[in-house]
């Protein structure tokens, strides 16, 4: 029996149809020597600071650097605490049973760093020891899936990809948890920082401030109408006053050639 694990139910349905696993069970498909199951994104995540004995915000506890990081079922917030996501826990139990039923696993999560990490965290959390192969395809057509399943790669060939995803995940945790707690302590409130969210928010705020503070000011440019040509040449330099533009115009040598940096065409009727 082979277990194929996809990243989402829709992909699992397509794979199940192709391999002949037509019997629908809760959280999986089975048949023709295969059981096909799926994840819902990240079912397993890194534990929150509370799991390491840091339930409160304290300057003396920073930075929090877990050694090693612990894996937990995806968490949801309930009030001021976190709890296991019931849907994630239910699907993990189904995946565990699918792994137990199989002799070998085929990893069909998305072909990329995050897809690899999704499977590896599940594999580690369930303490699975079954050998696994990798379905690595860039298309989800029937032809691509069949070809990929006919020549799966040894899953261990993607160890470095997994380690890359693992490093990214742990780096996000270290930055997000420690920076959020540090700012919250310093400002006396509840603040959230992140490796991606904070720079993104900064770009939005910077653009908002630029738009808010923008003041329209007059400017001048030099225009030229070359003799015998139906074109208008516009200088690239912007002048803050008419006087400066006139002075630049007087300094032009009519014998010099113009250098064209760009051309735009406008049609009028």
Descriptions of predicted regions:
Residues 164-194:
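Amphipathic alpha-helical segments of the small helical/lid subdomains adjacent to P-loop NTPase cores
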Residues 1-169, 173:
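Intrinsically disordered, low-complexity regulatory segments
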